[in-house]
């Protein structure tokens, strides 16, 4: 057992504890959180008054799916590949995982890029381990789809095949969903349709077991994603949602979570010209559930807390900024029973910070525990 004491504990499940303790059990779970915990048999870690929080949760990235020569997150042979699974390409020795641990990020939702109209499934994994099967928190988490520039550029412009236009992107997605709906109905009615790997992969989406994970920057693309999700009665997250602040009232009526980012960086294409750190605050004020994302490696994953802090500096309340990188993404991913807060019974993913990383330049992880194991200590 490990007892972290003399800490300012932000549990994300209630009031902060100004002189708090976190007890980590031998089973890798949180055994207790409070102001006066005693465990004579435990190893003592004196936090020295430092901030202690749950491990940060990244809701959208491509960590572990890269290669020095050819990235493993975009399968450019076909614009429709729902039968691909991120877990089959995740490389636990990718240095981005080490960066995440050093940055206090303990769980990531990682998966296919945005080249394809439908790219395959994302998985939620811990950032510490050597075998991906043992790092998985949930698989699948969501089905990636993409709107706008990227599919057009990858296939229409470069590949000389559909989609050339936004019309074709919507058509290809609708066609897949229509065929998947028919396939589902046949299976549910006891018929035995010919096996189709793509349609089989879409069944969890059609049954609302997992959401579409919709890459959309421009306001019209965001609303096209909403229109299609409503047509088929699907769950969905709005990933990037770069111009979401321009249509906040419309999005509030729909209620889909917004996963905002990557905002730290340049405006490399026209879809990003209205990119601003104002977006999370505007969407939160309108009533949306907001997560902050890095889209790593677009932004280094260790900058996730910094991005939340910058959003807080532009109108997102500080407590909501913390929620946007802890409990909110955990809830959106369907893993809040394990991560996102410091509560007894949850995974012991705990970070001791040198200073509050949302308010202090240079605030970084001093110690990072994942599943109760010390994964990082500054200076070691």
Q: For each of these PLM feature ranges, what is it?
A:
Residues 3, 42-46, 142, 368:
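Conserved beta-strand scaffold positions in the cores of enzyme catalytic domains, especially
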Residues 4-11, 18, 331, 343-380:
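C-terminal cap of metal-dependent C-N hydrolases
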Residues 7, 22, 28, 49, ...:
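Divalent metal-coordination and catalytic microenvironments
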Residues 9-53:
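Histidine-rich, glycine-flanked metal-binding segment
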Residues 50-112, 116-117:
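Metal-associated gating/positioning segment near the N- to mid-region
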Residues 68, 75-77, 81-82, 211, ...:
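His/Asp/Glu-enriched, well-ordered alpha-helical/loop segment
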Residues 86, 184-276, 291, 331-333, ...:
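Active-site core of metal-dependent hydrolases
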Residues 103-223, 227-236:
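Polyanionic/metal-chelating signatures
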